[in-house]
C-alpha cells in the first residue's frame, strides 16, 4: 500500500497530509487558503492521487507559512509513500494548456532536491493569493520529497490560467513518475542501486 500520513506541527502551522498514490483523485482540503485548496485539487485530480490535507496556520499574518508548510508536508508524505522507490518509473513530464496558457513540468524522483522554476506571472495576485507563494509551495515539496523539478510557464496572459496549468501539469508529471513500471520488475530505477 503506497500510502502515508504526515503531521507537521510548528509555532506557525499545524498540518496533516494524507496521500494514497494509487487512488482515484479523491480530495479533501481545508488549508485556510482557498486558492491553494483549488490548486491542490488539481494535483489530486490530474495525478489520480487521493489527498486529504488539513492546515491551521498564522494566516492572520499572511499565507506564506501555510502554503510553504503544506508543500513541505505533502513532500514528506510522498517520500514516505514511495519508500525506496523500487519499481517506479522515476521520471515524469507533462504539458498542460488552459486556453492561452501552456506549462511544462518535468520531475525526477532522484533523491536530489532541485527546483528550476521559470514562471513570469502577468500579475502579482490571483484574487488574494500572492503568486510568489506558488514557488514556495514547490520549493517545500522538492526539499522534502527529494525530487528534481523543472517548471516552465511557456505562455499565458492570465495569471490564474498560468498557475492552474502548472499545478495540473505537476499532478500529471508526478503520476507518471510515481507509477509502477511493470517492466522494471521491482528494481530501483538507478544504476547506483539506490535513490
UniProtKB/Swiss-Prot annotation:
Pathway noted in the entry: Amino-acid biosynthesis; L-histidine biosynthesis; L-histidine from 5-phospho-alpha-D-ribose 1-diphosphate: step 6/9
Predominant place of localization: cytoplasm
Enzyme class: lyase
PROSITE patterns with a match to the protein in the record: IGP_DEHYDRATASE_1, IGP_DEHYDRATASE_2
MF annotations from Gene Ontology: imidazoleglycerol-phosphate dehydratase activity
Subcellular location field: Cytoplasm
UniProtKB keywords: Amino-acid biosynthesis, Cytoplasm, Histidine biosynthesis, Lyase
EC number, as in UniProt: 4.2.1.19
Homology family: Belongs to the imidazoleglycerol-phosphate dehydratase family.
This protein's name: Imidazoleglycerol-phosphate dehydratase
Native source species: Aromatoleum aromaticum (strain DSM 19018 / LMG 30748 / EbN1) (Azoarcus sp. (strain EbN1))
Gene: hisB
